[in-house]
Amino acid sequence: MLDVQAIRKDFPILDHKIYDKPLIYFDNGATTQKPRQVVEKIENGYYNVNANIHRGVHFLSQAATEAHEEARKTVQHFLNARSSNEIIFTRGTTESINLIASSFTDECMSAGDEVIVSVMEHHSNIVPWQIQAARKGITLKVIPMNEKGELNLDEYRKLFSDKTRLVSVTHVSNVLGTVNPVKTMTEIAHEQDVPVLIDGAQAVPHMKVDVQDLDAEFYVFSGHKIYGPTGIGVLYGKEEWLDKLPPYQGGGEMIATVSFEKTTFNELPFKFEAGTPDYIGSTALAEALRYVDRIGIENIAAYEDELLRYATAGLNTIEGMRIFGQADHKGAVLSFLVGNIHHYDMGMLLDRLGIAVRTGHHCAQPLMHALGIEGTVRASFSFYNTKEEIDTFIAGVERVRKMF
């Protein structure tokens, strides 16, 4: 059982008031708040261990390098990757997917080849492939979903052809909360000798992720979704795949030798990390992962599921309530509309009550089109949220409903 009140003391922002109301932060799907330990790690890095890494013989550079590479090992162990060489630091999920979209397409795809995505993808797992489609003539195929917001695996199987080169799919929908059966989907793809990329941005903060068990070739996530800083993310890739893909960007550190006639590239993981990396961000991300480990990801998953069920039951008592996403296995995300109230109006009025939710299409316009709506109100929960906050939230939604 989590000691939620003790946890909340690590997050000073939760003590803030908005319009003289206690802040209720239900926008964790967009970004999470940061515990003191992570903020202090950033502060300590800049105050005491700030030097460019990998390139200096002096003490500070070596200390910063050691901290950065230890952070890489922390990520490796958190994901249960086989080697730290399989952990590439990026700016976030979006850059990680763009990296694979560019390098994989260059190495493994020709005009007419196909990538399979799902109807519930975030734009960051659609647009990079569309850019490659325009550049190289590849084609996107889309997995449909049923009325509950679950992917149709029978239709998924039918999408494969001799032109299919990659499956790129979200682990957890940022709108519906659906937890997709990505292990089964990976097995299906592997039956066709097709590699898999999984967008784990909404999964890693909320459930145990074991990349060796999932067996996908690539797995990506962002630090800021899991209590770490913005601007740092992770691309996990099986070493044999990262070895054969070309670099995404050129510059310092990703090279072995350079002449005007030829450049040879560095070994993994540095081949994909051109320029000065965010060595402060990497150590802060590692601190965030250690924080989550101390609480226990299984404890987090169980508690957030309890919050989800409690909030779902409460919202369903409200007249005109429509909750989008009724999958049997969901993450701590609730997207909804009430009657004819515009999602923006609901969000603005909840904000006046101190309640932070997200409104709009949530960077998933194709999914909104499939649902026949323009957008939703989204409440997304964390382990520092409480049932008392949910009670206030439900009362707030009901109060707004009565205004229209």
What would you call each of these model-derived segments?
Residues 1-404:
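Pyridoxal 5′-phosphate
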